[in-house]
Amino acid sequence: MYRIYTSLLLFVTVALFGQEPGIIAENAKVTQAGTGYAFTEGPAVSPDGSVYFTDQPSDRIYVWNENREIALWSDDTGRSNGMYFDAEGELVACADLHNQLAYFDSDKKRHLLFENYEDKHLNGPNDLWIAPNGDIYFTDPYYHRDYWEELHTEAQDTRGVYHLSSDGVITRVIDDYKQPNGIIGTPDGKTLYVADINDGKIWKYDIRPDGTLTGKTFFAPKGSDGMTIDEQGNIYLTMGKVWVYSPGGELIQEIE
């Protein structure tokens, strides 16, 4: 058995049944782990199995542990949104207060990782995935935030998806979406899934050795605010409910 964490603080236990239709254990149920947040986002599982999530308008990151306890982890997050742990166990976040990618050290101090493309600030990084080789893929849509300063505008000429190599080279790898959002890759680092949420589609790509993308293929007729993947390669899409798709693009389960 293993756990899939969905919809931020709505947890469901699932079981592996190969390619059989339905992957949810017969006695599984969705439970609410916490309440009282302004707007939760960005669940990320740490190496020890704890789940970190943000309350973005409140500029906070919380952690849920194996004892089913929730504790404040940081109240200086740069308005973190999507998050992911790297191979060293450091938490990397899309911090859109100043349109940045940031990481947190072991003392919970936030550090700038990246903030500009072609001498212009990003629109507002939303979600990210870190490949096994340390490369980062992140989506950069534009959602106006009430807490942004008046001069904070949509600076980029497209709402794109970017590749940040482990040696610091940035490349825009997708430029034809209406509004990119959720993103996830396979554990072998060979395949990337990206949601165009405003177009209601998930696209699948092959990842080249240099980190660029090829072989754009339609995967699912859904937009998705966030995505994850299980050990069998099934993709979990979230927006109102959770849709589970097989690696071949077959809808195999709905969770609500």
Task: Briefly describe each language-model feature range.
Residues 18-256:
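Sequence-structural signature of mature extracellular/luminal beta-sheet repeat domains
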Residues 10-18:
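Hydrophobic h-region of N-terminal signal peptides that target proteins for export
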Residues 2-10:
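Sec-dependent signal peptide recognition
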